[in-house]
């Protein structure tokens, strides 16, 4: 099955100038794009046909060669190869740079890889690269050492000369002054003139001294600099550098810009540097050691790969193919072009100008400026805006550089590689199709015809309705009658996929068998709305067509809606009757006392139905009916002598009989009222005990009965159904009094504001509850609103309370509860003030929903990313470890009751060891799937806890094994090998996240009686846990077992533990207002929480170890979801938590090839240690690391997966430097490169199957007569000839396509 083009690794590396020239088909020398007159590409320009290939198929530039027959010829006139135009999508060019430039990713990225390698601060590196400082690239230390005495002598002589010159100049001036003064004396000049002469001479002397001292100082400076000169020294003073070079240029070399970096890299000794750094790490400490560790990572990357560090400095820039940066003509004759063309043009312009300046021999300062501009042009081409101000286009918009083409949601990875638009798909509005079966959907005729067009056309030709494809196409476009018949034939048993966005879990795409319908809307079965979260208020759905037989088979077997009855998150049914169906079935099965025909006895069901039709009998009257094939329910009292299979006279109602007729014949009789809970129990039971076909058929029966009887029930809502309780004013008056009393206490200063608020909130919550209760008691059982809520069809009591009772307390925009309630109900109408404060909460609810939906979607994306490579890879990893899970707990009276969370903990797991009762009898063997039945048996036998296999203890090196994962909740059977359990886990956690976010919406911001937690604790808390962040107001946990003492001071409290083992005391400073969970002198256990508040999972890991940290995270996450009434199975959370603890931080590397401080995959760490120990060397030591899901996703072994997730440029920079290979084990990597994903049927164990004949078959192959054995040819004719008959072809089933 494996194709020739398949490959198992994808490596990324640093490209050198040679590589770039090797990829290139020619050098781009001109900045021109196309000729605006002829609209043809300019020669040697950015779209040149000679370099990138012809712009028209099989046609050269000058037109000498046209047509495919000249394929492969290179035109001697224009130099263009005659080939397909699509080569312009793959052929690259290059620009030869006149001066090297550094790659901005390696110099400006954080951390700066170049800086780490050369041990330079990024600031200094920037000075060198952008021509602000010179860098010494080499020093001839030997000759300098030899010559130093001579140079010292020369220096001293020069210095002495300068001193002598200065002294002689000063002496000359002094002499001249004396002469001048003598002359003035002789002339009898005034004292002022003499002073003037003296001052002038003093000034001259001072100038001479100053100049000479400066020269001497400069000489000293140059000499000192030269004496101590070493490689990598920077010199920002150009004058000083020039002098240094003029005097001592033969002993050192220095330069500016990328050339300096290049020279350094050429002479860089990686091995020596690595040894030096390892030495520092072994013996150093503090800052120095940390920096050495970081530098060693970079040095090691170049040492262990074939990458050359010279790849970080470019001598040539690749030019990507022109079709990837197109230029298109708009309607007005103007051109729209990709930003890359502008950026390339700037590079070429500056490069050409630099070449010209170099040819002209321009002054160094001008050349350097041009080189700096070239560097900046290449920087903005690679990553515009990374350094300095971004280059902008028209309208001050920053241009999109090569990096921007990869980054973000619109980048290459997420837009084109991970998400593609597909052919054979369509979308339309959905409407309800109550007449459909569960596995069907209604497909509009026109849509179906368009989707199946190629198939219809081929079939028309096969059936001779059309001569060729062209005429068949014409027939289809004209909607000829034969077309519909053919379409009908083609779509039978050809499933289609329906998808509704947002696809939050795998049930968002399901397969259906299409039924052609009139109109333009897709018809959807009402029972699958829950899975799609669809309603019919204008939702749209997309249709996709599985084409290959394999795809159709998968759609039919795995994705058909009747095979997706269970929810993957908790294994409970998702296709439940809802709304109208519930009302119908509730109406059918309600008991009504005193109605027509009560107490009568009927000989058969048909007789009862006849009585009902004649209005002699009410649907809900209690009567006795003789039933055939009655399967008794628990608690039915059988008459004497009755045996199963006989008819039975049963006390029931006609509605109950009709309801039971919808269930399978051998299903126990259901006497309960069919409300939402009962229906859920029935469907759950059906899914657990019956084949899927039966379950699907039963669901359809329930749907049909539900809709029919909902119509017959005539349930409506009128304003008169809303009955406000008459006792309301009295109740309110009583609570008003109590509230006034509290307010009075506050006014007197007896209580503070916080206490007043708490008390008032408590009072009004009680009032609200009391009114709600009175209101419920007042509603008659036949009140339609009561029936809707009681049956679970729609709405809840909180909403009814707001309509008919009291609106209650509401929150303000900050989320604080306002301690004055809204006393009116909506039936009575709100006052202006009440209406105003009510709108706050409602508006906040809507705003929150919008914000938190985005957050939840992002959480799902991160969860998928971290767990996408968790696939079931093997049957059994062979571990003996597991988790101990409770199945029963003692209640207040000491009696055993089923643990409330057993459905999401022990259920659907594999038992790790035999479960044995107190007498030693094995109740369930290890390896048994722990379903509802097993749990019930164990509970009956008094077992309180079981040890089950878990993903957390699985020892598979990649992915997980089937037994540790247990039952697949979506199918109810043990998970298949190849199941992508990681993605299912992420979807199961993320999908309710979105529901959580939307929960505030329906209640209009009213506060539930429990003072309900809004999901503001919910979603942010889930994110905090999965990102392993330290929460706000963190509570310390005891690091050792011992006695605790509480020491109080003015500002804070200190909790001091004296450990039992006699080690030194441990103190925890906490705020004075903290609520303590311990008392002075109490004994605390390791890991015990000391004050009220959230615990930091990293502390749990450090103090109590990985197992405790895993359990803590699972329990906390489940706590948030359960508080919102959402059930997710523990195993999903465990899959994610396992991914968070997959890595180990290496502390000491021992003699392994791991680096200290490195984050290593646990399996790699253990393999390395095993190898080292087997050679008798010292293994590495490490500590388990808890990583948040974002960090874990970015730290994955697969660079393709990490780059397509976040921080694309950073990931690619690092991966290229390390020469990383992607083993293509996860799903994302394979989607990106377009390979079949290694999950499900894409696993090698399914695709790479070879069939070998058995020894027996091989033996049989050669036992027949050979060509050389004595074979009598006479048997073919003559007397004894066997008779040959012609067999009519119709006897063979050669399939419909044979003719």
UniProtKB/Swiss-Prot annotation:
Residue sites binding Zn(2+) 1 per the record: 60, 62, 75, 78
Gene Ontology terms: cellular component: DNA-directed RNA polymerase complex
Residue sites binding Zn(2+) 2 per the record: 877, 954, 961, 964
Residues annotated for Mg(2+) binding in this entry: 535, 537, 539
Cofactor note: Binds 1 Mg(2+) ion per subunit. Binds 2 Zn(2+) ions per subunit.
Cofactor(s) of this protein: Mg(2+); Zn(2+)
GO molecular function, one term: DNA-directed RNA polymerase activity
Biological process annotations from GO: DNA-templated transcription
Record SMART domains: RPOLA_N (SM00663)
Keyword annotations from UniProtKB, A to Z: DNA-directed RNA polymerase, Magnesium, Metal-binding, Nucleotidyltransferase, Transcription, Transferase, Zinc
EC numbers for this chain: 2.7.7.6
Superkingdom of the source species: Bacteria
Catalytic activity: RNA(n) + a ribonucleoside 5'-triphosphate = RNA(n+1) + diphosphate
Keyword Zinc tagged: yes
InterPro entries linked to this entry: DNA-dir_RpoC_beta_prime, DNA-dir_RpoC_beta_prime_bact, RNA_pol_asu, RNA_pol_N, RNA_pol_Rpb1_1, RNA_pol_Rpb1_3, RNA_pol_Rpb1_3_sf, RNA_pol_Rpb1_4
Enzyme class, UniProt record, top EC level: transferase
PANTHER family assigned: DNA-DIRECTED RNA POLYMERASE, DNA-DIRECTED RNA POLYMERASE SUBUNIT BETA
HAMAP family: RNApol_bact_RpoC
Function according to Swiss-Prot or TrEMBL: DNA-dependent RNA polymerase catalyzes the transcription of DNA into RNA using the four ribonucleoside triphosphates as substrates.
Family under the similarity heading: Belongs to the RNA polymerase beta' chain family.
Subunit details: The RNAP catalytic core consists of 2 alpha, 1 beta, 1 beta' and 1 omega subunit. When a sigma factor is associated with the core the holoenzyme is formed, which can initiate transcription.
Protein name (database record): DNA-directed RNA polymerase subunit beta'
Lineage start: Bacteria, Bacillati, Actinomycetota, Actinomycetes, Micrococcales
């Amino acid at each position: 099955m494996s194709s020739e083009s398949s490959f198992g690794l994808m490596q990324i590396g640093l490209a050198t100038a040679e590589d770039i020239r090797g990829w290139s088909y020619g050098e781009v020398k001109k900045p021109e794009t196309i000729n605006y007159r002829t609209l043809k590409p300019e020669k040697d320009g950015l779209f040149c046909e000679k370099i990138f290939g012809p712009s028209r198929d099989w046609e050269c530039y000058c037109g000498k060669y046209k047509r495919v027959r000249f394929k492969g010829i290179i035109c001697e006139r224009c130099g263009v190869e005659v080939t397909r135009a699509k080569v312009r999508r793959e052929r690259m060019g290059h620009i030869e740079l006149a001066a090297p430039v550094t790659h901005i990713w390696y110099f400006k990225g954080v951390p700066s890889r170049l800086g780490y390698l050369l041990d330079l601060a990024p600031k200094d590196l920037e000075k060198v690269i952008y021509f602000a400082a010179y860098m010494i690239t080499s020093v001839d230390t030997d000759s300098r050492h030899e010559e130093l005495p001579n140079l010292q002598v020369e220096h001293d002589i020069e210095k002495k000369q300068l001193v002598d010159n200065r002294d002689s100049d000063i002496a000359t001036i002094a002499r001249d002054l004396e002469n001048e003064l003598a002359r003035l004396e002789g002339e009898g000049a005034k004292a002022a003139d003499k002073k003037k002469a003296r001052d002038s001479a003093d000034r001259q002397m001072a100038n001479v001294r100053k100049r000479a001292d400066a020269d001497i100082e400069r000489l000293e400076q140059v000499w000192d600099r030269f004496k101590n000169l070493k490689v990598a020294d920077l010199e920002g003073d150009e004058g000083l550098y020039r002098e240094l070079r003029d005097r001592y240029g033969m002993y050192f070399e220095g330069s500016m810009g990328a050339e300096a970096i290049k020279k350094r890299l050429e002479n860089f000794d990686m091995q020596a540097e690595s040894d030096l750094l390892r030495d520092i790490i072994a013996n150093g400490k503090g800052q120095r050691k940390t920096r050495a560790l970081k530098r060693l990572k970079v040095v090691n990357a170049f040492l262990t790969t074939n990458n050359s560090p010279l790849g970080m400095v470019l001598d040539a820039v690749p030019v990507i193919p022109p079709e990837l940066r197109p230029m298109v003509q708009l309607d007005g004759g103007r051109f729209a072009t990709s930003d890359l063309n502008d950026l390339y043009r700037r590079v070429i312009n500056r490069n050409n100008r630099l070449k010209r300046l170099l040819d002209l021999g321009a002054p160094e300062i001008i050349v350097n400026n041009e080189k700096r501009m070239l560097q900046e042009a290449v920087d903005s081409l690679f990553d515009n805006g990374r350094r300095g101000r971004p280059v902008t286009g028209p309208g001050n918009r920053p241009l999109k550089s090569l990096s921007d083409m990869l980054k973000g949601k619109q980048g290459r990875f997420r837009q084109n590689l991970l998400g593609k638009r597909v052919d054979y798909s369509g979308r339309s509005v959905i409407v309800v199709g109550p007449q459909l079966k569960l596995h069907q959907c209604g497909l509009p005729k026109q849509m179906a015809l368009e989707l199946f067009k190629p198939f219809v056309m081929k079939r028309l030709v096969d059936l001779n309705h059309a001569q060729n494809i062209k005429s068949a196409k014409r027939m289809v476009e004209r909607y000829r009658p034969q077309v519909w018949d053919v379409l009908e034939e083609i779509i039978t048993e050809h499933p289609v996929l329906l998808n509704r966005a947002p696809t939050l879990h795998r049930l968002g795409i399901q397969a259906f068998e299409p039924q052609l319908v009139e109109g333009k809307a897709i018809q959807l079965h009402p029972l699958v709305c829950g899975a799609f979260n669809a309603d019919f208020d204008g939702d749209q759905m997309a249709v996709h067509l599985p084409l290959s037989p394999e795809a159709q088979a998968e759609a039919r077997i795995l994705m058909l809606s009747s095979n997706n009855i269970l929810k993957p998150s908790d294994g409970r049914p998702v296709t439940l009757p809802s709304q109208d169906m519930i009302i119908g079935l509730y109406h059918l099965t309600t008991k009504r006392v005193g109605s027509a025909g009560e107490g009568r006895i009927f000989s058969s069901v048909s007789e009862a139905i006849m009585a009902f039709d004649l209005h002699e009998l009410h649907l809900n009257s209690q009567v006795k009916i003789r039933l055939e094939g009655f399967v008794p329910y628990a608690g039915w009292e059988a008459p004497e002598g009755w045996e199963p299979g006989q008819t039975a006279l049963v006390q029931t109602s006609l509605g109950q009989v009709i309801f039971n007729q919808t269930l399978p014949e051998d299903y126990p009789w259901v006497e309960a009222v069919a409300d939402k809970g009962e229906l859920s129990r029935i469907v759950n039971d059906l899914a657990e005990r019956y084949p899927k076909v039966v379950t699907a058929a039963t669901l359809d029966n329930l749907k049909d009965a539900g809709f029919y009887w909902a119509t017959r029930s005539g349930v409506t809502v009128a304003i008169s159904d809303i009955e406000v309780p008459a006792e309301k004013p009295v109740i309110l008056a009583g609570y008003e009094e109590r509230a006034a009393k509290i307010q009075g206490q506050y006014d007197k200063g007896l209580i503070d504001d916080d206490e007043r608020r708490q008390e008032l909130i408590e009072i009004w919550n009680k009032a609200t509850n009391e009114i709600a209760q009175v209101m419920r008691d007042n509603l008659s059982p036949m009140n339609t609103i009561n029936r809707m809520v009681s049956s679970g069809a729609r709405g809840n009591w909180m909403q009814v309370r707001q309509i008919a009772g009291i609106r209650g307390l509401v929150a303000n925009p900050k989320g604080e509860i306002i301690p004055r309630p809204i006393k009116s109900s909506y039936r009575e109408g709100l006052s202006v003030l009440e209406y105003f404060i009510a709108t706050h909460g409602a508006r906040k609810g809507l705003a929150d929903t919008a914000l938190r939906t985005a957050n939840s979607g992002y959480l799902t994306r991160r969860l998928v990313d971290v767990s996408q490579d968790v696939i079931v890879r093997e049957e059994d990893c062979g571990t003996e470890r597991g988790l101990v899970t409770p199945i029963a707990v003692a209640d207040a009276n000491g009696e055993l009751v089923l643990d409330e969370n057993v459905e999401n903990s022990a259920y659907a797991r594999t038992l790790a060891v035999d479960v044995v009762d107190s007498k030693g009898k094995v109740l369930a063997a290890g390896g048994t799937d722990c379903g509802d039945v097993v749990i019930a048996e164990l509970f009956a036998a008094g077992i309180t806890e079981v040890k089950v296999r878990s993903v957390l203890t699985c020892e598979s090196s990649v992915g997980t094994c089937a037994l540790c994962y247990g039952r697949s909740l979506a199918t109810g059977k043990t998970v298949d090998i190849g199941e992508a359990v990681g993605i299912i886990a992420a979807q199961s956690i993320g999908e309710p996240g979105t529901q959580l976010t939307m929960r505030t919406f329906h209640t209009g911001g009213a506060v539930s009686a429990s003072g309900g937690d809004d999901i503001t604790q919910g979603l942010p808390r889930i994110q905090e846990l999965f990102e392993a962040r330290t929460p706000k107001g963190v509570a310390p946990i005891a690091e050792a077992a011992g006695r605790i003492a509480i020491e109080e001071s003015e500002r804070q409290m200190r909790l001091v533990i004296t450990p039992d083992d006699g080690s030194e005391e441990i103190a925890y400073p906490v705020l004075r207002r903290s609520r303590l969970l311990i008392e002075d002198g109490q004994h605390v256990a390791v890991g015990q929480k000391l004050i009220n508040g959230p615990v930091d999972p990293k502390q749990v890991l450090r103090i109590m170890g990985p197992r405790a940290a895993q359990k803590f995270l699972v329990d906390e996450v489940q706590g948030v979801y359960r508080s919102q009434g959402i059930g997710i199975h523990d195993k999903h959370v465990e899959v994610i938590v396992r991914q968070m603890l997959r890595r180990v931080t290496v502390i000491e590397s021992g003699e392994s090839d791991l680096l200290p401080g490195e984050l290593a995959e646990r399996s790699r760490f253990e393999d390395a240690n095993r190898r080292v120990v087997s050679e008798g060397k010292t293994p590495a030591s490490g500590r388990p690391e808890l990583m948040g899901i974002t960090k874990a996703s970015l730290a994955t072994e697969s660079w393709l997966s990490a780059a397509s997730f976040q921080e694309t440029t950073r990931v690619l920079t690092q991966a290229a430097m390390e020469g990383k290979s992607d083993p293509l084990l996860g799903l994302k990597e394979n989607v990106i490169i377009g390979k079949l994903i290694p999950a499900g049927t894409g696993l090698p164990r399914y695709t790479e199957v070879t069939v070998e004949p058995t020894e027996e078959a091989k033996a049989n192959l050669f036992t027949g007569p050979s060509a050389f054995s004595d074979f009598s040819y006479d048997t073919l004719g003559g007397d004894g000839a066997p008779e040959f008959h012609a067999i009519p072809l119709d006897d063979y089933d050669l399939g419909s396509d044979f003719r």
